[in-house]
Amino acid sequence: MTAALHIGHLSKSFQNTPVLNDISLSLDPGEILFIIGASGCGKTTLLRCLAGFEQPDSGEISLSGKTIFSKNTNLPVRETTFGLPRTGRCSVPHLTVYRNIAYGLGNGKGRTAQERQRIEAMLELTGISELAGRYPHELSGGQQQRVALARALAPDPELILLDEPFSALDEQLRRQIREDMIAALRANGKSAVFVSHDREEALQYADRIAVMKQGRILQTASPHELYRQPADLDAVLFIGEGIVFPAALNADGTADCRLGRLPVQSGAPAGTRGTLLIRPEQFSLHPHSAPVVSIHAVVLKTTPKARYTEISLRAGQTVLTLNLPSAPTLSDGISAVLHLDGPALFFPGNTL
């Protein structure tokens, strides 16, 4: 199978400051990839290089087997087949929604029967058929998002690129537009690259996630693999919350840390030092011990919240704060037991 997108060893600097460093990625036909990372990590620059708005210093980019950038090739933007929705606004404010989508078809402008059929199909696909005669100033932000996607899909691009497409919308509208946009992309069989800083969004909607930090890709994997089998401590901390401790491995599949001796998931040899990570949801709090890994603790303070109970407790010399969706009624100062569900993760050499 020919990759919908292939990026090989791509690098880019601005004024001798590296922004992208040896980026390699591939995307299968119909696959949705989320690129996530903190602000300034290089994810938007990577998207601009893919779209042809920035020229990489080195590396190569190919689209469905066709090289569009390499040492000897640099196709103009007009000769590539990317769709890049200008999210949040229509590109031509004096044209109706219908004409804005027709604008995406290029020279045809929706004059032929085939072009009109394509425009009507995109209106229906994105749920805006009833808005066809309206003008941009008559649309809400969410409606303009749908128009932007319909216009980008109209010329049938091989790949859709989206840079923080939902960031300007309120939470309720963002959720609805996001689900509709993902559904439209999948219904149209399009590959897509989303740039996002929202890890929950990526975990829910991506086929694969690429985590970036300081111009490098730390790991590319499915959401499940990235969450359960992370290859890098920085990646796992960005993709989800974690409680970390310095630790040393033992020969029996455990590690010693400030919470005591805990089971770990690691293939490193005994004696290796590194960082142990526990997901907060692995903990549960009970009044008594049970035949599982138990850590004795003292409850310092419990604070009921809307959807969980915030509990501060001391385990040995360590003070932990956990947000537990359900917890027994415990008085401050009472002794309790933390149960650990499953092994902790261990990252050799990542000392705190």
From Swiss-Prot:
Domain of life: Bacteria
Keywords, alphabetical: ATP-binding, Cell inner membrane, Cell membrane, Ion transport, Iron, Iron transport, Membrane, Nucleotide-binding, Translocase, Transport
Binding site for ATP: G37, A38, S39, G40, C41, G42, K43, T44
Topology class, membrane: Peripheral membrane protein
Main EC class the enzyme belongs to: translocase
Gene that encodes the chain: fbpC
Any one GO molecular-function label of the UniProt entry: ATP hydrolysis activity
Record GO cellular component, one term: plasma membrane
Role played: Part of the ABC transporter complex FbpABC involved in Fe(3+) ions import. Responsible for energy coupling to the transport system.
One Pfam entry name: FbpC_C_terminal
EC number: 7.2.2.7
Subcellular location, principal: membrane
Record text on subunit structure and interactions: The complex is composed of two ATP-binding proteins (FbpC), two transmembrane proteins (FbpB) and a solute-binding protein (FbpA).
Family per record: Belongs to the ABC transporter superfamily. Fe(3+) ion importer (TC 3.A.1.10) family.
Protein name, UniProt field: Fe(3+) ions import ATP-binding protein FbpC
Ranges for domain ABC transporter: 5-239
Catalysed reactions, as listed in the record: Fe(3+)(out) + ATP + H2O = Fe(3+)(in) + ADP + phosphate + H(+)
Subcellular location: Cell inner membrane
